[in-house]
Amino acid sequence: ACNSTDPAAAQGAVAARPQVLSLPAQVGQLAFFDKRLSGGGNMSCASCHDPQYAYGPPNSISVQLGSDIAQTGARAVPSLRYRESTPAYDDNAPNPDGVTSESPGGGFMWDGRAATMAAQAALPLLNPVEMNAASKEAVVKAVREGGYAALFQQAFGARVFDDTDQAFDALGKAIQALETEDLSFHPYSSKYDLYVFNKIGGVLTPAERRGEVLFHSSGVANCSGCHYTGANFNGNTGLMSDFTYQALAAPRNDRSIPHNPDPIPAHDDPTYFD
């Protein structure tokens, strides 16, 4: 079979070939499922970002419990898929459509404060309402005493544990390597992806084709104005995002609203959130 010239057989052989991850990504894979990194020894990254649920939560709870089960997180847990192309935060992020003005965009966490996936991965570890590790030292100690300490040293140097900050940063880089290299984090396997890449199974129905036209129509729905689908924007392939932040809440209750019966002038009251 290895010498077969049948394209289908060759394609099957390629698909069956196991994915080879770099040493840092192998470390990241083990760390991703390591509950010992949490304060209670009961929670891993995968507890909230379950691979079986597209790296999202494995339950219907809107806000997940933390390692300290008396605590809950502050926001709904997002999927970790398709994060590898997200740029660092910028107050004036460029808009790919070339028309819309620049606006805040990029970064990780709800406010973009983590510039990279490596920086983002470190934040839940020390968050008291998430993994609740006591300190960087506690996390590094758990790695050093774990079953993959030797692999960690192979990936990041024999003396990596000599410096706590260096080892903690390396752990974030390992998880970033996993999320970048492991194709399950960005499979591009939906019907629309198959359609975009002209692959088997990617034939749209007439209704779906009409929906695509509507989605891209600037004069009607203009969904693509924010959900950009152009190829190779920051290295991504049609993620339907321009990575910017949008204000989708109710309009501000101020004097700019015509006939507002009870306006609250912006900035006049220190308790007013603008």
What do the predicted segments below correspond to?
Residues D68-F156, V160-T180:
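Periplasmic c-type cytochrome electron-transfer domains
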Residues D182-Y188:
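Proline-centered turn/helix-capping motifs that create local helix->coil transitions or kinks
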Residues Q29-K35, K173-I175, D182:
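Short secondary-structure boundary segments
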